[in-house]
């Protein structure tokens, strides 16, 4: 079996000069995603955030999550976070646009892992025509499904709170909230106060020190 990018997707089936463990693979993926985020997404300057705050740095997550390697790595690492923290999750979704590539990547990875998790996307407003849906993909979920809600970058948690409220109004249950980058500006605390601990691939401290 030939493995791309110098690491095995499945260490049981890949024959390489080096013997890899699951820990080796996770650390390699984690390091590669950090490098991509710093190269493609991290910027310094003066920025207005969606939360209304002003910041001296900005993480434009979509520059990474819409790249082929970035989408793959985010999908792998978010899938692992979801499974490690809540093995009974049966759906993954988030607010358009930031979550769109993430939920797609996680769903594809889950299929490759033979444990498929359908994706869904929460609109900011109803579609306005056709089915007039707020949530696209909900027909792939069972009534009352336990789902994970994801976002690329979390600041105050306001977007995630809106998603959670919308998901619950449709009869689904939120079992986990996850992000690629937690800016550590109150989002985790806001979510935890509502009973939803936030898990992340990187905190601001881990990403930029």
Predicted features along the sequence, with ranges:
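PRPP-dependent phosphoribosyltransferase catalytic core
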Residues: 24-36, 164-209
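Active-site-facing substrate-recognition patch
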Residues: 25-86
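Acidic, divalent-metal-coordinating active-site segment for phosphoryl/phosphodiester hydrolysis
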Residues: 151-164, 186
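Short glycine-rich phosphate-binding loop at a beta-alpha junction
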Residues: 87-98, 178
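Phosphate/pyrophosphate-binding loops at sites that engage ATP/ADP/AMP, CoA/4′-phosphopantetheine
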Residues: 78-89, 164, 168-170
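Short, glycine/charge-rich flexible loops or terminal/linker lids adjacent to PRPP-binding catalytic cores
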Residues: 103-148, 158-161
């Amino acid at each position: 079996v030939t493995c791309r990018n110098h690491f095995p997707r499945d260490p049981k089936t890949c024959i390489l000069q080096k013997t890899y463990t699951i820990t080796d693979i996770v650390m390699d993926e984690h390091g590669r995603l950090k490098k991509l985020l710093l190269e493609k997404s991290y910027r310094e300057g003066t920025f207005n955030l969606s939360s209304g705050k002003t910041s001296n740095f900005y993480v434009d997550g979509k520059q990474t999550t819409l790249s082929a390697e970035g989408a793959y790595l985010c999908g792998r690492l978010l899938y692992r976070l979801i499974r490690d923290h809540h093995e009974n999750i049966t759906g993954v979704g988030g607010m358009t646009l930031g979550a769109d590539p993430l939920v797609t990547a996680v769903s594809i990875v889950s299929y490759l892992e033979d444990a498929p998790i359908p994706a869904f996307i929460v609109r900011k407003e109803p579609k306005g025509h056709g089915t007039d849906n707020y949530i696209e993909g909900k027909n792939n979920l069972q009534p009352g499904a336990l789902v994970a809600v994801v976002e690329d970058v979390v600041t105050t948690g306001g977007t995630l709170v809106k998603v959670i409220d919308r998901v619950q109004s449709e009869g689904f249950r939120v079992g986990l909230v996850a992000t690629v980058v937690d800016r550590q500006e109150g989002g985790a605390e806001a979510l935890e106060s509502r009973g939803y601990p936030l898990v992340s691939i990187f905190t601001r401290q881990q990403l930029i020190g």
